Amino acid sequence: MPKELEDAKGALKTFGVDLQIANDVDADIIHAHTWYACLAGYLAKMLHDTPLVITAHSLEPFRPWKREQLGGGYNLSSWAEKDAYEHADRVIAVSAGMREDILTAYPNLDPDKVVVVHNGITMSQFETPADDDPGWKVFERYNIDRSKPTLLFVGRITRQKGLPYLLQALHFVDPNIQVVLCAGAPDTPEIMEEVKTAFAKLDEERGNIIWIEEMLPKPELNALEHGCDAFICPSIYEPLGIVNLEAMACGLPVVASATGGIPEVVVDGETGYLVPVDQLHDGTGTPTNPDKFVHDMADAINRIMADPEKAKRMGQAGYERARDHFSWESIADKTVKVYEDVLAERK
């Protein structure tokens, strides 16, 4: 096996499934999501002459850290994504920022074929739990003090989610602020060890921090989001940021990096605060000035937690924004319009 494809068994197995899917397709239009399904969509288009729509939730050229996880499979995922995108009838970007990234990564794409349709959420899934809802037991189980002002992070332990930067920023955050980290599913043992080391140092210095490594059941996560005071998203790569929408649907103000599609979700000064971040253009998204990014993040956290009444107003504004602009009903209508346009071109 070529050196470039070492550790690529996982990707090759995915391609095997893609071949089976492509052979069985019997549809008027194909809609594929992520590189895992892109090859199936591309092959089905060639086999059955069926128009192909792809929704871009992320881009392999902008996630070079995935090589840590996929090994040689990253070369295969990158190849599959590129070929599928360049032969698709439409590519849906989940944000305007993502559309720009798509055209940068794949300049051979016709810009007219790349359209924006945001992701959405089902608001009913994020309603305030009843007082006797068992989800509230999460606070007791993890010794989370509901009387303390509490900041919440929810995300996988990956390079793109920016958790190491948050752990650095928390050294400069008011120690009276309780911090809850729902962080698990590390991409690699290396990044898990990095996070463990940073957490241990932080816990020794400031304390008042709870790390939940397991994936919480939805009722418990919903109760946790309704029981905290603010949400933090330190991502360095985020095509849209569903996690922020979910927090807003629970009425939480959000502090988030001003990267990718996040500024299309979080309105600075209205639904929370955006943390400015200048980034390298080498695909990694690494902040050009990590110290500034860390200190600006800490400052935004301190500001939002220092004014509970303003934080509540921001949380209410965020709830209304999530409800009014990111409902699945409106997004479904926009997606159907994409299908209709593609099919009309075939007539």
Question: Which positions does each model-derived feature cover?
Answer:
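A short helix/loop element that forms part of the nucleotide-sugar donor recognition site in Leloir-type
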Residues: E127-I144
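Nucleotide-activated donor-binding/catalytic signature segment of Leloir-type glycosyltransferases, i.e.
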Residues: A183, M192-M215, P219
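A conserved mid-protein helix/loop that constitutes part of the nucleotide-sugar donor-binding site
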Residues: P149, F153, T158-F172
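Aromatic "clamp/platform" in nucleotide-sugar-dependent glycosyltransferases that forms part
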Residues: I236
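Carbohydrate-associated surface elements
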Residues: G97, G120
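Nucleotide-sugar donor phosphate/pyrophosphate-binding loop at the beta->alpha transition
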Residues: T50-V53, P61-D83, E100
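Short hydrophobic beta-strand element within catalytic cores of glycosyltransferases
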Residues: P253-A256, V266, Y273-L274
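Short alpha-helical donor nucleotide-sugar binding micro-motif in glycosyltransferases
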Residues: N222-C228
